[in-house]
């Protein structure tokens, strides 16, 4: 075994007050513990090979936080912290194994359409859950899986610590670096404006 890609993930939307404890447990069990379990299961084999790489998928939301996504944000920030710590340990060990943390922007998958969302999300988006899912899917998921895979492979070959996928991820990374505290106010203002003018009305069946 020379490479492992921990990529499984789910999404959930709702306010902290509106979420149940079970919502956090579900997201963390897949998004974070899936990465931990996959890493620990294969790390001994990677080290035995003398030449290996661990690729853990965080998210654009592992770079900055957004209201209504506390469970998802927490899981992806956790993946980032875990992977950065792991990378430093591997660098110190000089064992021939390395690690990269991937931060995708909007990738054209079913993650938005299959996301679990509750009614409290309307307090943030101004829309019901189905409308929010569809709008996120239609407007924010731009990069194809094939494009994402190419960026990841190139990043692994270059032994990058952080792999950003998509212009949205690059812009978000820059925003967080330049405005580590102020960006939160910008997010609140922009999302408040978006919620105010969000399409309302009867939700339609979800389409891919």
Regions found by a protein language model. Give the residues of each.
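Substrate-binding pocket helix/loop in short-chain dehydrogenase/reductase
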Residues: 15-16, 20-26
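A short helix-coil junction within the Rossmann-fold of NAD(P)-dependent oxidoreductases
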Residues: 14, 41-50
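Active-site loop immediately N-terminal to the catalytic Tyr-X3-Lys motif
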Residues: 17, 64-70
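Active-site helix of classical SDR
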Residues: 39, 75
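Conserved NAD(P)H cofactor-binding loop of Rossmann-fold oxidoreductase domains
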Residues: 7-12
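SDR active-site lid
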Residues: 91-167
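Residue(s) in the substrate-gating loop at a strand-loop-helix junction
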Residues: 59
């Amino acid at each position: 075994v020379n490479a492992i890609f921990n990529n499984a993930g789910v999404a959930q939307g709702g306010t902290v007050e509106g979420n149940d404890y079970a919502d956090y447990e579900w997201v963390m069990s897949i998004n974070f513990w899936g990465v931990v379990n996959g890493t620990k299961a294969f790390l001994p084999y990677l080290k035995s090979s003398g030449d290996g790489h661990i690729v853990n998928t965080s998210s654009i939301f592992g770079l900055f936080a957004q209201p209504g996504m506390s469970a998802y944000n927490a899981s992806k920030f956790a993946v980032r912290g875990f992977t950065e710590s792991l990378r430093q340990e591997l660098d110190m060990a000089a064992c021939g194994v390395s690690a990269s943390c991937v931060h995708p922007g909007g990738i054209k998958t079913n993650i938005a359409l299959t996301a679990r969302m509750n009614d409290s999300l309307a307090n943030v988006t101004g829309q019901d859950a189905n409308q929010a899912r569809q709008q996120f899917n239609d407007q924010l998921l731009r990069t194809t899986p094939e494009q994402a895979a190419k960026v990841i492979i190139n990043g692994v070959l270059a032994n990058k610590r952080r792999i950003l996928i998509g212009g949205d991820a690059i812009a978000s990374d820059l925003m967080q670096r330049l405005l580590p505290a102020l960006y939160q106010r910008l997010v609140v203002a922009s999302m408040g404006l978006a919620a105010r003018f969000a399409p309302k009305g009867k939700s339609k069946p979800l389409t891919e």
